[in-house]
Amino acid sequence: MKPMYRSRSWRRKYVRTPGGRTVIHFERRKPKVAHCAMCGRPLNGVPRGRPSELRKLPKTAKRPERPYPNLCPSCMRKVIKAQVRASLS
């Protein structure tokens, strides 16, 4: 095993070859799930992937197509309500 692969930042994937041997493939770990900027809840509709994988996706697949895509839907509603109330008063 190369010294660079001894670190646990590389995920070890055990692969069975056609010849019957089990070999280890090293791959980078997936990043953590995206979280809401206000409450910290995990965001739906945002894929977990390395930048090289996300680069291949269209922009619409990377984040929700609605106002404030960095907030969860409930926090987004709170922000929009606060803005409307502020503009009315």
Curated annotation (Swiss-Prot):
Xref: InterPro entries: Ribosomal_eL34 (IPR008195), Ribosomal_eL34_C_sf (IPR038562), Ribosomal_eL34_CS (IPR018065), Ribosomal_L34e_arc-type (IPR047868)
Matches recorded under Pfam families: Ribosomal_L34e
Location of the region described as Disordered in the Swiss-Prot/TrEMBL record: 41-69
Keywords recorded for this protein, A-Z: Ribonucleoprotein, Ribosomal protein
Domain of life: Archaea
Any one of the GO BP annotations: translation
GO cellular-component term (any): ribosome
Basic and acidic residues compositional bias, start-end: 50-66
Stored Gene3D superfamilies: 6.20.340.10
The encoding gene: rpl34e
Name the UniProt record assigns to this protein: Large ribosomal subunit protein eL34
GO molecular function: structural constituent of ribosome
